[in-house]
Amino acid sequence: MISFNGASKTYPDGTVAVHPLDLQVRTGEVCVLVGASGCGKTTTMRMVNRLQEPTTGTVSVDGRDVMSVPLRELRLGIGYVIQQIGLFPHLSVRKNVATVCGLLKWDKAKTNDRVDEMLDLVGLPPAEFGDRYPHQLSGGQRQRVGVARALAADPPVLLMDEPFGAVDPIARLHLQNEFLSLQQRVKK
């Protein structure tokens, strides 16, 4: 569960990015933040993984205040998919998906099995896509790789910041529907 208890963010110049927020997102629940550009959606999500620290209040993941969790531990337990996808252009699809597994020091066999499983899960057969590079993929395929990477280490929390905003409207609808189907299977 993710809990915001009076969590707010005010920048040093006095700009209020997030007014005090009380919100609970239960395990396995999909929560979508909707609002105008600049209203604090991204800042709210960034407070969960401490890319932004709350000015007041607390943000908790599974009952632990994120400010008390060692940063590396916190971030390794959260999958994160962003609008710009954030794939490493010099790494193959396979190596992009394996990034977090490597940070967790998984052995090669476990990592390879997990990468294959995740690529299959997002509809990118490993034999066909594993050795490709991001520039060889469509926008929707790159987004799927980003989702596979975010899920590879089986994090208890998955944050997605406008994950389908960079693709065309038809692909976006298809990816959103696929994500909801995927979420039902993995319960993230």
Where do the model's predicted regions map?
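Conserved ABC ATPase signature
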Residues: R132-L137, Q141
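Catalytic Walker B motif of ABC-type/P-loop ATPase nucleotide-binding domains
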Residues: L158-D161
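Conserved ABC transporter NBD signature motif
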Residues: G57-D65, L74
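Conserved ABC ATPase "signature" region
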Residues: G102, A109-E128, S181
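A short, proline-enriched helix->beta-strand linker immediately N-terminal to the Walker B motif
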Residues: A152-P156
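The feature captures the beta-strand-to-loop junction immediately N-terminal to the Walker
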Residues: V34-A36
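Helix-to-loop junction immediately C-terminal to a conserved catalytic motif
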Residues: N49
